[in-house]
Amino acid sequence: MDFSKLRPLACGLWLAVFGSAGLSQNVSPATDFKSGPGNGWYSFASSSPATVIDLIQSSRARPAATTQAELFLPPNLPKDVKSAAVVLVHGSGGVYPELTTYWAKLLNAQGIAAFVIDVFGPRGVKSTAEDQSQVTFASDTADAFAALGMLASHPQIDPKRIAVMGFSRGGITAVRSGAVPIIKGAAPAGLRFAAHIALYSGGCAGMLSVTPKPGAFSPEPMLFVHGDEDDYAYLSDCRTYAQRISAAGTPAELVALPGTRHKFDLDSPKRVNLPLSTKTKEGCPLEYDLLDLKARDRRSGEALSADKVKEISKELCDAKGASVEGNRSARDAAGKAVIDFLKKTLAV
């Protein structure tokens, strides 16, 4: 999905549907969670890398940043019990209510902690829908790894049972945080996510997708959940992506939801059209190989020059117009798929 340069009308519609992230009240600064703090908002150190290469190559500049996240521990968790946990990464509209009112509650009901990141608020951004360059995609991933490190230090969280779950733009981080070069370059020492979940994910095609090949991804399993009527990020692209990731050696499954559009986890069933929103055309052949840092045409495997990338983008990838629509029955089906996956992967 190409999220860049939504026009004002589309941005306004987007914000009406998604809400916007902002600086939260009563945020407690923390360097770690060793004291075992309870539920609430916490701010902690992260970074704002400019590109994915800056994530991979630790010698490159990574400007210091502060991020924040809201912690939801399962109710009545015994002090001597370590729970599994999930880091939730929002999309272009920032943190939206259903992340906490639906997803965090669903996870808590299964005895799983939830840590909902606000990537945008501490960086002074409400939404990147109109201009994705306001916050780099690499910053999302840096924040997810920072959250992993915080959770791993909590005495009631099992550091080996922490998953990441991303929504739309956040799905890009959910997938890329499983890429071996990114783990080696940016994950906290000795840590990695135990599972990766991408809901109506961006980045299944185009330059934000990772070339799936042996050695590109870690062995930790992936789950994609996607609507078959999603016209913002296409099911066919995510299905192909999951199949190629599996073929390269990382277990990846996809659950398709019939009659379901983008942003199906919203409470509101009202369909909102975003006629000026930019996106990636179905079947865009571009991808990025993290093992040799080259743009490629996935049809041929050919490495591409910057000029060729621009040419293909213009001809086969850049497009406008999409829609979003809440669907509670689809959301419940997605919730079941997520919990079933976590039961298998995190032993909950």
Enumerate the language-model features and the residues they cover.
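Bacterial N-terminal signal peptides that target proteins for export
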Residues: 1-10
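Bacterial N-terminal signal peptides
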Residues: 11-21
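N-terminal cap/lid segment of alpha/beta-hydrolase-fold proteins
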Residues: 27-81
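Acidic beta-to-alpha connecting loop that harbors the catalytic carboxylate
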Residues: 47-48, 228-230, 258-261
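Serine-hydrolase catalytic machinery in alpha/beta-hydrolase-like enzymes
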Residues: 56-67, 76, 82-153, 315-323
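Primarily recognizes the serine-hydrolase "nucleophile elbow" in alpha/beta-hydrolase
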Residues: 136-218, 232, 236
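Short beta-strand/loop motif that positions the catalytic acidic residue
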Residues: 218, 224-226
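C-terminal catalytic histidine-bearing segment of alpha/beta-hydrolase fold enzymes
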Residues: 251-348
